[in-house]
Amino acid sequence: RVIEDDYFRATETFPGIYKISQPWFREGTLLSFGFLIVGTKAAIMYDSMFGYGNLRKFCEKITDLPILMVNSHFHGDHAAGNFDFDCCYIHPFDLPGIYKGFAQTQEELLARAIDTAKPEFVSHLKAEDMCYPRPMKAFPIFDGDVFDLGDRELTVVHVGGHSPGSIMLLDPTYHVAYSGDTCNNDTIVTWADSIEEYLA
């Protein structure tokens, strides 16, 4: 099952699990993905990507259940779309980074989107569709916390490494681990800090 709009494409990879991408990105540009995990009483949007387009409205085409915005970490390619949601859940180590971010205005974000887009898609991009930083509630999550979606429970695992507060979500129902940038071969950006802590 595939669901699309002007900005997003969702592919159902397992029952109730949708991988969300933005297929209009030019080859060679930085990509980011999010996952919508739909239970029987709530859903989780795991990472909000770049903020190009209204991710919340897109998710509401897939489910009418309450959607919890959960971040793997604070970097702008994973959390810039948070501000279209009522609140987000993020590890406290990464909470200060939410507003440091990717872009501060819709115009700045539009310029980034244009720089990323395939030429034939540039005319579709509009400033009013960009998600910009504004006040929102952010709730801390910790290692071992559990999100109960009804037919499945997702457990928070604090892993650090890529950022101080990087987390994974474990879904034992489908034997899936959602990892953000934690399981990557070239993006462990805080390794030096970690070594200093271990040596102290």
Task: List each model region and its residues.
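Active-site HxH/HxHxD metal-binding segment of metal-dependent hydrolases
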Residues: 50-148
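Metallo-beta-lactamase
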Residues: 42-45, 50-51, 139, 146, ...
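Short, hydrophobic/aromatic-rich segments at coil-to-beta transitions
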Residues: 14-19, 144, 153-155
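Short, basic/low-complexity N-terminal boundary segments at the transition from targeting/disordered tails
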Residues: 1, 11-15, 119-127
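Conserved beta-strand hairpin/beta-sheet module of binuclear metal-dependent hydrolase folds
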Residues: 7-61, 168-184
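Short Gly/Pro-enriched turn/cap motifs at secondary-structure boundaries
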Residues: 8, 25-26, 131, 136-138, ...
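Short beta-turn/strand-loop junction motif enriched in small, turn-promoting residues
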Residues: 23-25, 75, 154
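A short catalytic or substrate-binding loop motif that flags glycine-/basic-rich loops and adjacent residues
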Residues: 2, 27-29, 160-162
